[in-house]
Curated annotation (Swiss-Prot):
SUPFAM superfamilies documented for this protein: Origin of replication-binding domain, RBD-like, P-loop containing nucleoside triphosphate hydrolases
Cellular component annotations (GO), alphabetically ordered: host cell nucleus
Subcellular location: Host nucleus
Sequence motif RCR-3, location on chain: 100-103
Protein name per its UniProtKB record: Replication-associated protein
Cofactor annotation: Mg(2+); Mn(2+)
UniProt region (Oligomerization), positions on chain: 175-187
Motif (RCR-1): 18-21
GO MF annotation list: ATP binding; DNA binding; endodeoxyribonuclease activity, producing 5'-phosphomonoesters; helicase activity; metal ion binding; nucleotidyltransferase activity; structural molecule activity
Oligomer and partners: Homooligomer. Rep binds to repeated DNA motifs (iterons). Forms the O-complex, which is a Rep-DNA complex involved in the initiation of RCR. Part of the C- and V-complexes which are RepA-Rep-DNA complexes involved in the c-sense and v-sense transcription.
Signal peptide: none
Name of one Pfam family that matches: Gemini_AL1_M
Domain CRESS-DNA virus Rep endonuclease: 11-114
Taxonomic placement: Viruses, Monodnaviria, Shotokuvirae, Cressdnaviricota, Repensiviricetes
Amino acid sequence: MASSSSNRQFSHRNANTFLTYPKCPENPEIACQMIWELVVRWIPKYILCAREAHKDGSLHLHALLQTEKPVRISDSRFFDINGFHPNIQSAKSVNRVRDYILKEPLAVFERGTFIPRKSPFLGKSDSEVKEKKPSKDEIMRDIISHATSKEEYLSMIQKELPFDWSTKLQYFEYSANKLFPEIQEEFTNPHPPSSPDLLCNESINDWLQPNIFQSSDERSRKQSLYIVGPTRTGKSTWARSLGVHNYWQNNVDWSSYNEDAIYNIVDDIPFKFCPCWKQLVGCQRDFIVNPKYGKKKKVQKKSKPTIILANSDEDWMKEMTPGQLEYFEANCIIYIMSPGEKWYSPPELPPTEAVHSDRS
């Protein structure tokens, strides 16, 4: 089942990291060594730790970390040391962060060689003379190293390379999506768990077991599910509550496709506007798609079922040719809803309310 967490997943990506451990009395040297070991895979170059005192006398710890490769983490507890949890930030101006840390320390420890922040894309530090204009490669290298989000990355390019930004925006958006992939918010069912109130629940259960809940041989081919019926009957909520999935509504966007998803959902998209419908319905493997603002790519390394949801006025089968309909019926379980059916069970009334309802 999908996670119940409604918070967006934590993400940090930067070669310069600023850590603050509130109410932490750790020795700066010990803290430095522990943090250094945590980031070995990203090739640490420099770390500075300083212990300071709050006005109330309690101690806290600041740390500036610089690595050759950007630190990429999605666990907010990654930098925890001895039970102390830090505030994790990207150090956009390492010179200022270092000056701030060294302002009033009680104890300090450094390891490695500090890498001063260069003046904006000049290839020279603030104290050095500006001798020559940087190349585009140098500018982009600096942007990639210091940008902390997709929006900041594109904004920095627009500022430093305005002509390239205006003529090659599609390619910069593609690289931005690669550097800062979108973290999809996990679906949370807004309603209490319940079973579908259907006339033929058995056919749905027979489809769920082999296609969603049971692992199968990688060589086997899954089967999709097509549900057509009225709005406000819980189709989308039921489909989205089954597990990790790719969800498309209004249009199919391949740019954020998740290979780890168990299944796909096509929700309220007219048949004529669904690209690769045969590949999705047929649970095919390794087919080519063309993401918006990106290059063509191969997706779906293993057979993956698709749940197609449609209202009666957008019934896919009414738009298909005889040949298309034959393919659809061969690769898809079709469930046409009857009047009164819902994909959730009505809440049970308390005994007193139930008696009153019967009398009325």
